[in-house]
UniProtKB/Swiss-Prot annotation:
One GO CC term on file: cytoplasm
Catalytic function, reaction form: S-ubiquitinyl-[E2 ubiquitin-conjugating enzyme]-L-cysteine + [acceptor protein]-L-lysine = [E2 ubiquitin-conjugating enzyme]-L-cysteine + N(6)-ubiquitinyl-[acceptor protein]-L-lysine
Function summary: E3 ubiquitin-protein ligase which is a component of the N-end rule pathway. Recognizes and binds to proteins bearing specific N-terminal residues, leading to their ubiquitination and subsequent degradation. Positively regulates hedgehog/shh-signaling pathways that function in eye development, neuronal specification and somite development. Activation of shh up-regulates transcription of ubr3, which in turn promotes hedgehog/shh signaling possibly by controlling negative regulators such as Kif7.
Pfam name, any one: PRT6_C
PROSITE patterns: ZF_RING_2 (PS50089), ZF_UBR (PS51157)
ZnF endpoints (RING-type): 1270-1328
PANTHER family named among the record's database cross-references: E3 UBIQUITIN-PROTEIN LIGASE UBR3, UBIQUITIN LIGASE E3 ALPHA-RELATED
Effect of inactivating the gene: Heterozygotes fail to form cohesive and stratified epithelium in their optic vesicles. Average somite angle is increased by 30% and the posterior central nervous system displays a gain of Rohon-Beard sensory neurons. Defects are the result of decreased Hh/shh-signaling demonstrated by the reduced expression of the Hh/shh target gene ptch2.
Protein name: E3 ubiquitin-protein ligase ubr3
Annotated keywords: Metal-binding, Transferase, Ubl conjugation pathway, Zinc, Zinc-finger
InterPro entries: E3_ligase_UBR-like_C, UBR1-like, UBR1-like_winged-helix, Znf_RING, Znf_UBR
């Protein structure tokens, strides 16, 4: 009842009344009233009601206004943290200098208000959302706080008055329970509602949660109240279940309980009733494994999984069955117990249930600055952790959900203090590991590695969604995050049961994604599961490993390492048992995933390197080592197999795996530990055993025979060579790589850097990316740290970014210094680090180029040999590999085979063999003290060599070798020959003794048997015969005739060579000289000289080292070199061999020929490109100006680039010039000032477009059209400043009929990108330049020469009359029409048809609005104006391209593009269709040749435009175009002279307007005084005076803007300044006339200084006598009047005076025009990109008010536009395209704010131009991915501007695509 009465009162007074009641000491009635009111207002059954929110706001404010209340609360804000929360795509900052946690981030405001000068920071776009850490000393250093959070704000904030938040404490609990009840009510389990529309529920709650968010933003005081309510258990208890009588609340609570149940969770009470499984469970009792505990939802039943088709392309039987595990999970309660004790806990529960709605997440995070809340919330989060991950696994939106989860967890776990706290109190580590295990257990399958039938190991199935979609990453990322804290990692390493659990987790990945080699047909479905496998190993196994390793750096942590190593070995042993592994890997199986091996390897390495542990104490017994070595070795051999195309039937993905394995992000977690582990095994196992294992794994044992032929059971012959090369390269890497064997971190970084730079020049960012970094961000050597930069400057030179003429933009690159090539280039490291084999070649090519350039070596060099860092003492055993007999036998055999030219040997094989010998010489075994060979004969039947030292074995001679060969082999043939000749071996006793002693088994095959025997002795399985080692041979061998394979027979070969003698013979062979090494050579040799060179150098270096290190070797060498007899090749090679050799040689020669041809072709093409592509190199001298080709009177001949014929252009078969027509507004964007306009970057700055050339001319024309006759206006100005048509050519010509067939063929060719043939577009057939029309060349001579050029002696008046006659020649027309279309009289020829078609093209080039300026569009007047303006546009643009003047003279790039001569004739031919009626012919009014007809003005509705208002260059073009062509030069000069007088008079008028009244008076008097002097018509003083006196008659022309002029003329006008101004005023006209004369008559343009330009131009145009001294040139001296100058000026002024109805200021502005414009410029941009970005990326769109997704800026006018924005679309055209049409006549240059790149729109196409903002390393940062500070690159911006002005975008940028109006 009471509530009802309260509800009726107004809210304000109710709230005030209640607050007063509650403040009393006895507040019970107030409380009761409030509760009743709230029961009624916040009734959850009423749904979400805006009224309820309104009530809450009034109640909280307690009678004040809510906004007022907010302000008051905010004034008590004591928060010292920023805590601003943002969502995905927000722009934030990260400073590595200030960050303690790598996840630290700052909002833009805090970043900009802090001082981060010189720090290593970057801007980034948030992926998952985040929060600002400013003020949080746990996450970042205080020095980085902004000035707002640097002060400990809390200290000086007054304490909060009790009653301020009194109402909040009462009202908010009820408000929050309402939200919770609403969430309970709205939730339905997925089963019940098919579409389960949780979004709807959330939408209705939106205002409520937004209100909570608003409260959090009131600051610390309000957050404290909220925290109290959210965490108060008592309030929760009272409100959660509801009072007895509240049926709704009861029902509601039951819904909550059922939701808990359905989630597979049990509340603790129920659990207790079931017999307290709780915390009492011991580790062992956990028994059934995480899976079985998960109630109904979790058990992944078999039926479920077997329904899913088997998609991962593995050959399972039918479907793969998932496997259930019983691992001893730590604590079953982790996965299924939840008990909520406060609002916060239940709120989080619903947040999870509703899959993390953004608003809820933001609210929960906004509360974090409150410390109490932070701790409670973190505990709550951990308590719900298992539940979160279970929900994530079931979610359909797992991506979004993952991001939201990490958004929260990263805020909590980055804080070490907090992470440690929850690890200790809430078992965070146990929870995480258990949940990880539980997650992976849902997708386990039986492993098929090794023993497919009896394999007991289970692995994850990489085809499962969980792995494919990376669903596990939030969990793993949290795990890595907490392991980065030392205190947490230590707990983990100390907890042995946890470690064991972790090892079992890692073993799930051991052997995953197994590949089986396809032997028959190509695999049908190429599985892409390998992406998931590599990602999983890196993220779930390697990164936690790196995290743990960072905490095992010092001696004190030895025990951790020992423990991990022990558990690794135990788990590995279990794994070997589970997969049934004995001693041999199964054939044709390959997995790249051995995380257990890698954990073991990395902890070993760390223990030895950093903790001083003894390696042997960490190693298992020999048997285990032999097992451990097998799988990593298998991977190395398989890499070779993949590169030898043996896995080609498995598809491309297998190559993808091989590449990923060595790729920079993976290599130090994969191939590096593998190689290190093999190095450890090699250093501890018997070297003979190890070497023979390698050759057996690589399947090349059969090849290692001295026989010339052999059978290989496992390899095709074309696979033998790459596999042998692979095996040897692997051995070299194994023996020479020192990454884990003694190099310091700095040395490693340097070696990595050098190897990457040697492959290619690199940008800074790609180098950062390619250097394998320790994936844990807290590790020491991080790319980007100081050591990285120092190292980089030590090894590389910076090449600044350049713009290549071809238009491709280079970034700033780093290139190796010369001394790096000389001393540090390490081909072995390069081979290890190359993803693509071609990179090795690239490094070698660059090396060879360096040697040539520095003159060290000119031929093709071999990879240089590099001295190695000394081995760490623990790994000394590795050297024994190089000193074992097995390797020496292999080396001997291969040297022999190469010398004998056996098949499948190669330069690379020799190179690697020599490398191994040299490594052996450089790394002697320590205990081998005896220098000469020991006498002990080893008890070993493969005793080729007496001892193991390489040095002594080098000179050991081997006389005879026993080989097993097929009967057909040449060796058998030779033996038969010998027998036929009764040739027996010599039989003296001593000889036969050595014969017996030196008979060797050549096949290393016996070694394999030996290896097997040793292996089996160790494993105590001696009952197996060793004989099983001899493999059954395959029945078919490739190079034998079909049928039964020939029997193998044993033969004895006579060899009598030592390794030394073979090396000498190979030297002779390579140098093709018989005695290439003389005796004297040995004496003077110096190994240091032989660092760089080819095979000869390498052999010489080895021989020098051998003789330097052993006297015996030196003696043997002298003997060998002393026998300077020609080498006798051992017996003949069989004809079959010969044939194959010849074939190979022929092939080689053919290949070389082909290479040579290709190179020649390429160089020809290149030289052509250099001459032809004039656009690319503006300064080239090869002028292609067709007009200047012929200066003789003969006809011009043109070459057709299509048919190749040369001939004149004729009426019937015209030739045309390839041209590109494009509309252009470049001229219209010119301004008066030379300084470009600045791009606005604050709200105060603006750009005003009114002062541009285009705008000024528009205003001028519309002004004239208001007062004068339209047809006259249209001949008084030019248009085309905006949207004018510019014509340019590449200079190539073709027959027009050839062109048509060319276009036809293009039409049928669908592949052309970005070219629209329907629009007439094509590329020039010769130079491939873009074009869209053909301009016909008129037949006849190229230039008007001879008689046409003769200097004229006629008087001025005669010439004036002749010109008038020429104009009349075309016939007289009726008086009324001033311009009239004339009927074509001629029958059209092909030429005229083409000319008309080009005119049509020209008209179609620009938009209608740029053509119609007349009152009646489409009229002849309009057409006439458009046509002559095309000529004007092209002349003006050529002037702009020449730098705005003609001082540079000669041929410029612009001249080469210009086709004005041809264009002029086409326009003239078109204009011939019009004639100017003599009555209105301006010529008569210019020369007063007929008396003026003033009387006729009266019947005209409007006067004509006075001469003084007309644009003089326009008149020039009109006259020249309408007179018959070719025009004599004397007539041209006459027209120029007459027009110069007018231009000069206009200059005087314009000048006089700028004078003050006194100055006018003074000059008028001076002029009058001089008027009667002789030659007064050539003195500007008298003319100026006359002008002023005439114009003063007009009503107030001079008196309009007296204030402005007085301001203008504050400077005093001296005669010099007046002369200068007059010249400047006339210059634009003179330049244009001169340029036109140059194109019509071929006159040259001599260059000159700027100050001499006026005199030079007047001389060129024949205005001034050439004798005049250039210094004192007077502009008036060039005048030539055909009648009295004063009469003419009076006449012209009278036209202005007669204008009664034109307002005077208009007349003044038309008179005071200034024809000068500065060069066109793009906007001036700020130096720092951040200035643009900060202002524009948040700026809102003018049409919809929202922030655009892709904002862009027009760099021409500064307009802010939406790229692709639908808000600004008009008629299906997006804003950028629209703007490009409006602003640039279809050319637009836009800077994309969020990407820092520039796009160009040209017509219907667009292209990405690149960026003009580069970082400190000269690199672009497209899409701002790296977020480093960017600075304006002036050179690039200049190039962009040049391309815009020169209209060369189409030619220079190659990658164009259609935009379909969508930009």
């Amino acid at each position: 009842m009471m509530a009802a009465s309260l509800l009726r009162r107004d809210k304000k007074s109710t709230a005030a009344h209640l607050k007063a009641d509650l403040k009393r000491t006895d507040n019970s009635s107030g409380l009761r009233q409030l509760q009743e009111l709230l029961d009624s207002v916040l009734n959850p059954e009423r749904g979400s009601d805006p009224e309820a929110l309104d009530w809450c706001k009034w109640l909280l404010a307690g009678g004040d206004g809510f906004d007022e209340f907010c302000r008051t609360v905010r004034s008590y804000d004591n928060a010292t943290l920023c805590g601003l929360v943002w969502t995905a795509n927000f722009v934030a900052y990260r400073c590595r200098t200030c960050g303690i946690s790598p996840c630290m981030s700052l909002c833009a405001e805090c970043f900009n208000n802090g001082d981060h000068t010189g720090h290593d920071f970057n801007m980034f776009r948030s992926q998952a959302g985040g929060a600002c850490d400013c003020g949080d000393g746990n996450v970042m250093r205080e020095s980085g706080f902004c000035n707002r959070h640097r002060l400990k704000t809390g200290e000086n904030v007054p304490s909060v008055p009790r009653d301020l938040l009194l109402m909040s404490e009462m009202v908010l609990p009820r408000f929050i329970i309402t939200i919770i009840q609403y969430l309970r009510d709205g939730y339905t389990e997925p089963e019940s509602a098919a579409d389960r529309d949780l979004q709807k529920v959330l939408q209705q709650l939106d205002p409520h949660i937004s209100f909570l968010e608003e409260l959090t933003k009131m600051g610390g005081a309000m957050r404290t109240v909220l925290t109290k309510i959210l965490t108060d258990q008592q309030t929760f208890k009272e409100l959660s279940m509801g009072q007895e009588d509240n049926v709704y609340a009861k029902k509601n609570y039951e819904k909550y309980l059922s939701a808990l149940k359905s989630s597979g969770l049990v509340s603790v009470e129920e659990k207790g009733a079931a017999g307290g499984a709780g915390d009492g469970t011991s580790d062992a009792a956990a028994g059934a494994g995480a899976l079985s505990l998960l109630g109904a939802t979790a058990t992944a039943s078999l039926d479920d999984s077997s329904k899913e088709e088997d998609q991962d392309g593995l050959q399972g039987v039918g479907q793969r069955k998932r496997v259930k595990l019983s691992s001893s999970t730590k604590d079953p309660s982790i996965m299924d117990t939840l008990k909520h004790k406060c609002f916060l806990e239940e709120l989080l529960f619903w947040t999870i249930k509703y899959e993390f709605p953004q608003k809820m997440v933001t609210f929960l995070l906004n509360m974090l600055p409150d410390q109490d809340y932070k701790i409670t919330f973190t505990k709550t989060f951990v308590q719900h952790y298992a539940f979160i991950m279970k929900t994530l696994m079931k979610s359909h939106e797992s991506d979004t959900m993952s991001n939201r989860i990490v958004h929260i967890s990263v805020q909590l776990f980055s804080n070490e203090e907090l992470a440690r706290h929850v690890t200790e109190e809430c078992q965070l580590l146990d929870i995480m590991v258990t949940v990880l295990l539980y997650m992976m257990e849902s997708c386990l399958i039986k492993s098929e590695l090794q023993d497919e039938e009896n394999n007991r190991h289970v692995v994850v199935n990489c085809g499962e969604a969980l792995l494919k979609n990376n669903t596990y990453w939030p969990l793993v990322s949290d795990f890595i995050n907490i392991l980065s804290h030392q205190s947490v990692a230590k707990r983990f390493l100390e907890d042995h049961s946890l470690l064991l659990l972790w090892m079992s987790f890692v073993s799930f990945f051991q052997g995953m994604n197994l590949n089986k080699r396809e032997l028959n047909e190509h695999v049908e479905f190429e599985s892409q599961t390998y992406y998931a496998a590599f990602a999983a190993e890196l993220e779930a196994c390697a990164q936690p490993m790196w995290g743990l390793l960072t905490h095992c750096k010092v001696k004190e942590t030895q025990d951790y390492t020992k423990t991990v190593v022990r558990y690794c070995l135990e788990t590995l042993q279990m794994w070997f048992d589970a997969i049934g592994f004995v001693d041999e890997p199964s054939l044709n199986q390959l997995t790249f995933h051995l995380p257990l091996h890698r954990y073991y390897a990395m902890f070993l390495s760390k223990g030895v390197k950093c903790q001083g542990l003894d390696l042997d104490s960490l190693l298992p017994d020999q048997e285990m080592l032999m097992k451990i070595m097998v799988h990593p070795l298998q991977i190395q051999a398989s890499l070779s197999e993949i590169h030898s195309n043996m896995w080609v039937r498995n598809g491309l993905q297998i190559k993808g795996q091989a590449m990923t394995y060595v790729q920079s992000h993976f290599c130090n977690s994969m191939i590096d530990p593998d190689i290190y582990l093999l190095q450890v095994c090699a250093s501890r196992l018997d070297p003979d055993y190890f070497i023979s294992s390698v050759f057996e794994r690589f399947k090349v044992v059969d090849l290692l025979t001295m026989a010339s032929q052999h059978q290989n059971a496992v390899l095709d012959s074309e696979q033998e060579r790459p596999m042998l090369e692979g095996a040897l390269t692997f051995l070299v890497i194994l023996c020479s790589l020192r990454i884990h064997l003694g190099m310091s971190d700095d040395e490693i970084l340097r070696a990595e850097m050098v190897s990457q730079l040697c492959m290619n020049d690199r940008t800074h960012s790609s180098l950062l990316d390619l250097i394998p970094e320790n994936p844990n961000p807290k590790s020491g050597v991080v790319p980007g740290s100081c050591s990285f930069e120092e190292m980089l400057s030590g090894v590389a030179d910076f090449k600044a970014p350049v713009f290549e003429p071809g238009g491709s933009m280079q970034q700033g690159m780093y290139t190796p210094k010369a001394e790096v090539w000389e001393k540090e280039f390490d081909p072995i490291m390069v081979i290890l680090r190359t993803v693509y084999r071609r990179d090795v070649q690239s490094a070698m090519d660059r090396y060879s180029a360096f040697l040539k350039q520095s003159g060290v070596h000119t031929g093709n060099p071999w990879p240089p040999y590099k001295e190695r860092t000394p081995l760490h003492p623990c790994y000394k055993g590795l050297v024994r590999l190089l000193h074992c007999k097995t390797l020496h036998i292999v080396i001997f055999t291969l040297l022999y085979k190469i010398w004998m030219d056996h098949q499948n040997m190669s330069e690379h094989v020799l190179c690697m063999v020599l490398y191994l010998i040299e490594l052996g010489l450089d790394n002697q075994v320590q205990d081998d003290k005896v220098e000469e060979e020991p006498c002990i004969e080893e008890h070993c039947h493969d005793s080729w060599f007496p001892g193991t030292s390489l040095l002594s074995n080098l000179h050991h001679v081997i006389n005879f070798v026993r080989v097993r060969v097929p009967e057909t082999a040449p060796e058998v043939e030779r033996k038969r020959e010998r027998e036929r000749e009764r040739e027996t071996p010599p039989s003296t006793s001593s000889e036969s003794a050595t014969f017996g002693q030196n008979l060797r088994e050549a096949q290393v095959f016996s070694l394999v048997a030996e290896r097997r025997r040793k292996f089996q002795e160790i494993i105590n399985r001696s009952n197996h015969e060793a004989s099983q080692a001899v493999r059954p041979k395959s029945s078919a061998s490739r190079w034998l005739p079909p049928g039964t394979p020939p029997q193998l027979v044993t033969e004895i070969l006579e060899i009598r060579e030592s390794m030394l003698s073979l090396l000498v013979k190979l030297h002779q062979k390579l140098s093709a000289k018989q005695n290439s090494l003389s005796l004297s050579w040995l004496a003077e040799v110096d190994p240091a000289h032989h660092a760089h060179g080819d095979g000869l150098t390498a052999i010489e270096r080895i021989l020098a080292k051998a003789s330097a290190r052993s006297r015996h070797s030196k003696r043997c060498l002298q003997e060998i070199c002393g026998k300077v007899c020609p080498p006798i090749p051992p017996k003949k090679i069989s004809p079959g061999d010969k044939k194959s050799m010849d074939k190979e040689e022929r092939r080689q020669r053919a290949r070389e020929r082909q290479q040579k041809l290709l190179a020649e072709f390429a160089s020809r093409q290149k030289s052509f490109m250099e001459t032809a592509m004039d656009v690319e190199s503006p300064e080239a001298d090869a002028v292609m100006d067709v007009s200047s080709e012929e200066s003789l009177d003969s006809e011009v001949l043109y070459d057709c680039v299509i048919c190749g014929q040369s001939g004149p252009s004729t009426e019937d078969r015209p030739t045309g010039l390839v041209v590109l027509l494009q509309a252009s507004s470049v001229l219209g964007h010119r301004c008066r000032s030379d300084m470009p306009k600045r791009l606005p970057t604050t709200d105060e700055e603006h750009i005003y477009p009114e002062d541009t050339c285009g705008a000024t001319h528009d205003v001028r024309l519309s002004l004239m059209q208001r007062y004068f006759k339209d047809s006259s206006c249209l001949q008084s100005v030019s248009i085309g400043w905006d949207g004018g048509v510019y014509v340019q050519t590449c200079g190539h010509t073709l027959h027009i009929d050839c062109h048509k067939s060319y276009m036809e063929s293009l039409r049928n060719d669908q592949v052309l990108q970005g070219i629209s043939v329907d629009k007439g577009e094509f590329t020039c057939p010769l130079c491939r330049q873009f074009a869209n029309s053909v301009l016909p060349c008129r037949p006849g001579r190229g230039m008007e020469t001879g008689a046409w050029h003769a200097p004229s002696t006629k008087s001025m008046s005669t010439l004036v009359k002749e010109v008038e006659d020429l104009q009349e020649q075309l016939g007289i027309f009726p008086v009324r029409a001033s311009i009239k279309q004339r009927d074509p009289i001629l029958i059209e020829s092909n030429l005229s048809k083409e000319m008309e078609s080009v005119i049509k093209d020209i008209k179609n080039t620009t938009q209608k609005k740029y053509m119609d300026y007349g009152k009646n569009p489409g009229s002849p007047d309009n057409d006439f104006l458009f046509m002559y303006s095309v000529a004007r546009t092209n002349l003006e643009l050529e002037l702009v391209h020449r730098g705005g003047n003609l001082c540079s003279g000669g041929a410029s790039a612009a001249a080469k593009r210009s086709c004005l001569n041809q264009l002029f004739h086409v326009l003239a031919m078109h204009m011939r269709l019009y004639s100017i009626d003599s009555a209105y012919n301006p010529w008569t009014r210019l020369t007063l040749s007929t008396q003026s007809r003033e009387n006729e003005y009266c019947d005209e509705e409007r006067p004509e435009v006075p001469m003084l208002f007309r644009d003089v260059p326009s008149l020039l073009i009109i006259f020249i175009l309408t007179m018959p062509q070719p025009l004599r030069k004397e007539h041209f000069t006459c027209v120029v002279k007459v027009l110069y007088s007018l231009q000069f008079t206009q200059a005087l008028a314009a000048l006089s307007i700028r004078f003050s009244r006194e100055e006018r008076l003074a000059w008028s008097n001076t002029g009058a005084a001089k008027k009667n002097l002789p030659n007064s018509d050539k003195s500007w003083e008298s003319l100026l005076g006359h002008m002023i006196s005439e114009l003063t008659k007009a009503k107030d022309v001079y008196d309009t803007n007296s204030e402005e002029t007085s301001a203008l003329s504050s400077s005093v006008w001296s005669p010099q300044s007046i002369e200068f101004r007059l010249q400047q005023f006339c210059l634009p006209f003179l330049r244009l006339s001169c340029l036109l004369q140059h194109h019509l008559y071929g006159d040259s343009l001599p260059g000159c200084l700027v100050e001499e330009e006026f005199s030079l131009l007047t001389r060129c145009l024949g205005l001034a006598a050439s004798v005049q001294c250039s210094g004192s040139m007077s502009s008036a001296a060039c005048l030539e009047w055909n009648i009295s100058a004063f009469d003419l000026i009076s006449q012209w002024c009278s036209e202005v005076v007669a204008l009664s109805d034109t307002p005077s200021q208009q007349s003044a502005s038309l008179l005071g025009q200034d024809p000068q414009w500065a060069a066109p410029r793009l906007l001036q941009l700020p130096d720092n990109y951040n200035t643009i970005f900060q202002y524009y990326h948040r700026k809102s769109c003018s049409s919809c008010g929202k922030t655009p997704k892709d904002p862009a800026l027009c760099l021409v006018c500064g307009a802010f536009v939406c790229l692709k924005g639908h808000c600004c679309k008009q008629q299906g055209v997006c804003e950028c395209v629209l703007h490009s049409q409006h602003c640039g006549a279809a050319t637009g240059i836009f800077l994309l704010i969020n990407a820092s790149v520039i796009i160009i729109i040209r017509g219907h196409r667009f292209c990405l131009w690149g960026s003009v903002y580069l970082d400190a390393h000269g690199e672009e940062d497209r899409d701002l991915r790296r977020g480093k500070p960017l600075y304006l690159c002036e050179e690039r911006y200049r190039v962009l501007e040049q391309q815009w002005v020169a209209h060369t975008f189409d030619h220079i940028n190659k990658r164009w695509g259609p935009h379909y109006n969508g930009l």
